[in-house]
């Protein structure tokens, strides 16, 4: 069905600059690329070897930054650095900046990576290092086209130079987008992944069901052991 001009304009206004839609990934051409046949155990082992080191590294970097900024705010130092970060993360207050910078538990990132990339087998991951299904609306940035369209619109996803860059972009998106304000508010107060995933209903077209699925993935695979 072809979108009207009004629908297209509304879509661009309502959808965050970086749009993440897990339920649309297969339909728009993120189906598995040609890989050697693997058992479920082999597929999960490959996923962990590829993804978890990058998530560990980015999480540690972000936590160091968060703690440094928190200390600077208490001491009233590094004002230039604080102001630059507020601009980058669209934070108006010190508290909003801390909300933006605090990284959420790794178990959530791992579970989302597994879901969005079909355990690192999706085309978008293997051709563009895009493990979290991040959409692109900037024609000047590196990106990859989906194989199918939404109406007459080509769907574009970001292309990253590395898995680590994809992880860093994912955390930055959740730290900046207005769609995840409630998620940020809660993650400043708690590190409980099962409470936090309930606030990711706007990450996916699945809505509240998305959080339930993440909870199941975390529990079944014991991803909370990485927190």
Regions found by a protein language model. Give the residues of each.
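Catalytic cores of secreted/periplasmic lytic hydrolases that degrade extracellular macromolecules
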Residues: 2-111, 115-227
